[in-house]
Amino acid sequence: MGILSLTLKFKKNFIPFLFCIMNVNLTAHAETQKTNAKWDPTVLGFESPQGGLLGDMYGLRPALENAGFHYSLAYVNEIAYNAAGGYNHDKEASYIDQVSLTFTQDLERYTGIPDAAIEGNIVNRNHDSNLRRDRLQDSRALRTDESQESWGGQSITRLGWLTFSRSFDDRKLHWRIGMMNKLQDFDQAIGCDFQTLNLCGGKSANSGWWYNWNSYYWGTVLKYDLTSELTAKIGVMEQNPEMGSRRRAWSLSSDGSKGFLLPMELEWRPMLFGKLPGIYNIGTQFTNSPQADLSEGKSGYPGAIDADGYREYHRSWYFSTAFNQQITQKDDDPQRGMSLFSSLAFSDQRSNYIRYSASSGIRYRGLFDLRPEDWIGAGVSYIKISNHYKGNLNYLNELNNVSDYSNPLYNPIPDHSVTAEVFYRFKITPWFELQPDLQYWYHPGGIKETQAAWVIGLKTSLNF
């Protein structure tokens, strides 16, 4: 079955619910068996570093590690080329890159405090080159995906997080405090190896209340290990839309905070089918920060003409779930085989233009004996747009008396979009990887008038 056939099937609105059903069925019918196998997330997409380009740096790295300082210095670039279709057919190769330093300083060895550590992340991003914005999508529409997930909108060096953590209760209760990013504790089921954004990680960032990467929020998190496999998590963070701005790259201030964000999650990390690891989570977010209605006004009129502006809500929720399960093992090697992943999220469509989003796909590590560390990945994402948002655009078109899509005053009406991606990642050396990919965009930005697009991508990764 071709990608076009798959796309036509996705035009039905019931498709996202199949992701949910698949998630429930896999969890309900799989039985956890007692096994001596080690829980190894490699085939799930979480591959441990195997050494860097700079080696031990004349003994510096081992000396730092002996002092409890562990770090990862990595470089990534992403290229995307519009091979066919899209809103603008002029050819362009968009390029972005980033360098990241992620580190942990073990404090337990010096203080005796269980699991005490300082963790930090610094990211340098370069270039505002965005194929989705410049070629694939109508500029009048809001984004539903990215062809280069690492695009950050600017060249900047900024703090991603800086936190202190420790444990209590015989290392069952874990506490973190400081300038934190959600990736440290929440929504960790799915890794970020695809180049399209919606296949990179889970769906919790689609709430629009926090960022996936390299932006921090003041807050604190508690995690409790209910069993060796099951963990409950809860946090309190500032809800601050200013944190992604340039002026807040290194700021300690909480100016701009609109309220608090309360994330909660239950995570399960079992060994299923006797020996195969998996990660399952279900979570919610609550915020009391003001959220503007996308359609209705404060006085009961349409917000576009209401003298008091759009209605605001001070209690908003967001729900997400995900799983990532290894389903095969090749030649009794726990680090070779296939994994299956899926994620699903629902928002408050009164104030979030994305009503729900879903993704599903597979990864295979070591399919070929001659290339045991290479990866193959394939996935599909679906975005459904809020009825409130669409209603407001329809009203604006009526107000302006325009119905012609080609009229600059016309607001295109989005409904849903589908993005598919296939990649192959070559492990050239333990520290150098090349990952060509092919992307298919159906209804970019959710706009049916925009021609489907084919994109050729290339991701390059270096570990130092």
Locate each region found by the language model.
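Short loop/turn motifs that connect adjacent beta-strands in outer-membrane beta-barrel proteins
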Residues: 31-32, 54-71, 106-118, 169-172, ...
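N-terminal regions that are enriched for targeting/export leaders
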Residues: 32-84
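Residue-level signature of outer-membrane beta-barrel architecture
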Residues: 62-64, 77, 105-109, 165-168, ...
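Transmembrane beta-barrel strands of outer-membrane/channel proteins
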Residues: 71-79, 118-124, 175-181, 234-238, ...
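Outer membrane beta-barrel
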Residues: 96-241, 352-356, 367-394
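Signature for the C-terminal beta-barrel architecture of outer-membrane proteins
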Residues: 204-330, 335-340, 344-347, 364
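Outer membrane beta-barrel transmembrane domains
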Residues: 265-267, 283-317, 328-333, 348-356, ...
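Outer-membrane beta-barrel "beta-signal"
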Residues: 452-464
